[in-house]
Amino acid sequence: PGHSLMPATADNPEGYWEDAPLVGLDDALLRTLGLRWDSLPPPPSGWRTLPIVRRFAADAARVVAEEWGPARFAVVKDPRLCRLLPLWVDAFTAAGFDASCVLMARRPQEVAASLARRDQFAPEKSLALWCAHLVEAERDSRGLPRTFVAYDRLLAEPAATLDRLCRDASFPLQPDAEQ
């Protein structure tokens, strides 16, 4: 992650491990597109070519430079990336990074229960959001080195999962089973 992580909250005391400037930019772009993080419709067709999005592309490049600067690699976590991935792939590529994607999948019932607790969402909305995020991330990450990781597998077998993740997504890490 970058330098400016979102703080922990009462409903997530361990923290989100999400970069606040990136999340803020994603939320602002979604608002500009008439969406929110929990909107069911995808961004409009051709959203990347809209003139206003060019400003966000420049802001994304600035965020990458400020948060990751000369780092050899960057790890970014923000569920909004599922909807806005092309913008960030372009920003990281322009900064000299080779983009790879990890598509982390939690069981849909776990996601629905979590969103019901935190946001009082109906199970149907939560499941539809889960599906939309996963489908858009899969579509927009085609052509990039990527891997799919089951969240429960990561928790059960962290060393083996990280080893496979690094190999499949071409990450320059050699995970240490002791860490």
Name each model feature, range by range.
Residues D38, P42-S45, V53-P175:
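PAPS-dependent sulfotransferase catalytic domain
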Residues P1-A57:
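PAPS-dependent sulfotransferase catalytic core
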